[in-house]
Amino acid sequence: MAEGGGGARRRAPALLEAARARYESLHISDDVFGESGPDSGGNPFYSTSAASRSSSAASSDDEREPPGPPGAAPPPPRAPDAQEPEEDEAGAGWSAALRDRPPPRFEDTGGPTRKMPPSASAVDFFQLFVPDNVLKNMVVQTNMYAKKFQERFGSDGAWVEVTLTEMKAFLGYMISTSISHCESVLSIWSGGFYSNRSLALVMSQARFEKILKYFHVVAFRSSQTTHGLYKVQPFLDSLQNSFDSAFRPSQTQVLHEPLIDEDPVFIATCTERELRKRKKRKFSLWVRQCSSTGFIIQIYVHLKEGGGPDGLDALKNKPQLHSMVARSLCRNAAGKNYIIFTGPSITSLTLFEEFEKQGIYCCGLLRARKSDCTGLPLSMLTNPATPPARGQYQIKMKGNMSLICWYNKGHFRFLTNAYSPVQQGVIIKRKSGEIPCPLAVEAFAAHLSYICRYDDKYSKYFISHKPNKTWQQVFWFAISIAINNAYILYKMSDAYHVKRYSRAQFGERLVRELLGLEDASPTH
């Protein structure tokens, strides 16, 4: 098929429309935060920049060029089969004879489970996940910790027990750093560039620092507790329950690590000494995310218990760690016919077959150096001496499982039991026109590209306060995720049609409502 020719370019818009029809469930798409990036153009399938996570989401063993946007195309020619030990692979159940199979049946209607009134405010959506009873528990635990701390280390004459109103204001100050990124939340009272007089008048800096000193979600370890995150685990459990009850995900979902690295604005203003003093994160945060809306369905925190050989760094690229993470993230997904997209570190035949028995279907990118390739035919994992033409591919099938080797300036391998191997798709490239591919490759590119775009935008709204204690880091990341989820529910509600807030405006409104500077509607 011609690459970059005029005919291909003329056909591309129609092919793109056909692809959009297949992926119309990505209904929030590029406007997920009420704003458009420099590379949006109304197409949710292109990455926003060359540095986008989508470049790593579909890296090949030869060249790191991701699949582009999907579309529809006539059946392409397939790459000629290389000489291979056919008998061994046939004995293992793998065959080049392909058969059509229907997609996993899914009849559930995804979206919010509760209809919010048009008058609902930002804090109403936030409190779907962090309600008053959770905040009241923080008040109790913080006061308990302050009392025990002073019994042990001496009285603090400046301390007065915190109230629910003050706890909301405390959260509001912290959340404000997700909108106005600054080195320290104390900049609000500084009188400098990041100062905010209207916020500073609600609470004195001295009072804020006292609450920050004693703030706790769980004040004391119980005798049975051994988990390193015991100080935040009850909050994570409560948050998970609220995610489950507030939203029904679409059929297609993604397992991945969201962008939670250091804020680039902060790094740019740091001295080299300050950067050296900052401790490396001691945990890994994984999520299961709805690929139609960006709603994060489930959070999993893997704590690095120590620096020994069993620590997180030692297991960073090992399949057993990532398989454990995937099982934990999908423990509530059994029997629902979800389609889960995975990266190379999770993709494995053993895991996918295990999930299929539970009614969970998968489509994952495969890399020989990062994936568990046990049980896969060696001939499909070895690159031929002469590269095939762009868009050619080979497929072998075992039961419902298809192993795809597709060429696009590099070999890309996919393992899936969610898509028929005989169904055709197409990747649309701006300069090259359409590139034929199996439907599984097209679907992977569409959904992963959407999540990468979402990631690029929502990571800008993480709370930039960086505490040294691991449980506090996890807590503020979880709060940030809850706010982003709240905004998604807001965009899918009638309230969005009354006042169309962007993500930044929604965050600003939430801060002012928590600090009591704006009236919130009485929907709770």
Curated annotation (Swiss-Prot):
Its main location: nucleus. Residues 98-108 have a biased composition (Basic and acidic residues). GO terms for cellular component: nucleoplasm; nucleus. Pfam families: DDE_Tnp_1_7 (PF13843). The keyword Nuclease applies. Changing D519A: No effect on DNA transposase activity. Changing D455A: Loss of DNA transposase activity. No effect on cell transforming activity. Residues 67-79 have a biased composition (Pro residues). One of its GO terms (molecular function) is endonuclease activity. The modification Phosphoserine is found at S521. Its EC number is 3.1.-.-. Keywords: Chromosomal rearrangement, Endonuclease, Hydrolase, Nuclease, Nucleus, Phosphoprotein, Transposition. Disulfide bonds: none annotated. Residues 47-59 have a biased composition (Low complexity). One of its GO terms (biological process) is non-replicative DNA transposition. InterPro entries: PGBD, PGBD5. Has been domesticated very early in vertebrate evolution, approximately 500 million years ago, in the common ancestor of cephalochordates and vertebrates. It is linked to Induces site-specific DNA rearrangements, including intrachromosomal deletions, as well as inversions, duplications and translocations, in rhabdoid tumors that share developmental origin with cells that normally express PGBD5, even though these tumors may not exhibit apparent widespread genomic instability. This activity recurrently targets regulatory elements and tumor suppressor genes and promotes cell transformation. Transposase that mediates sequence-specific genomic rearrangements. Can induce genomic rearrangements that inactivate the HPRT1 gene. This is PiggyBac transposable element-derived protein 5. It comes from Homo sapiens (Human). The gene is PGBD5.
